[in-house]
Amino acid sequence: MIVGIGSDLCDIRRIERSLERFGERFTQRVFTPGERARSDRRAARAPSYARRFAAKEACAKALGTGLSQGVFWRDMEVVNLPSGAPTLRLTGGAAARLAALVPPGHRARLHVSLTDDPPLAQAFVVIEALRDESC
């Protein structure tokens, strides 16, 4: 069953301006070390950061909290599955909120779609609760 859906559209130029103006102060506040390493390896850093920014916003919406109620930017990390598909690793307040959304006897699966077509980056996050067969 679907327990949360979120989407976000991010202007890549806005992220580019934040990178130019605030540099590491911006990236360290919003992104995990792993996300920074992946984005900083790219020739075009801004689209990579913008996709991740949009994913975090979409995730916060899917959790039903936005960036409040103990959910912080770095509680949500865009990572890749072995297949290369993006997903999110949640910690802290985001993980606690996810646990509260998922009914007993179920486990969460996060579906993430990321894209960019300059000047925009977009993300969709769907939180699915699957029956846990081990219960």
Curated annotation (Swiss-Prot):
Mg(2+) binds at D8, E57. It is found in: Cytoplasm. Its main location: cytoplasm. Its EC number is 2.7.8.7. Its cofactor is Mg(2+). GO terms for cellular component: cytoplasm. It is an enzyme of class 2 (transferase). InterPro entries: 4-PPantetheinyl_Trfase_dom, 4-PPantetheinyl_Trfase_dom_sf, ACPS, Ppantetheine-prot_Trfase_dom. One of its GO terms (molecular function) is holo-[acyl-carrier-protein] synthase activity. Pfam families: ACPS. Keywords: Cytoplasm, Fatty acid biosynthesis, Fatty acid metabolism, Lipid biosynthesis, Lipid metabolism, Magnesium, Metal-binding, Transferase. GO terms for biological process: fatty acid biosynthetic process. It catalyses: apo-[ACP] + CoA = holo-[ACP] + adenosine 3',5'-bisphosphate + H(+). Transfers the 4'-phosphopantetheine moiety from coenzyme A to a Ser of acyl-carrier-protein. Belongs to the P-Pant transferase superfamily. AcpS family. This is Holo-[acyl-carrier-protein] synthase. It comes from Methylobacterium sp. (strain 4-46). The gene is acpS.
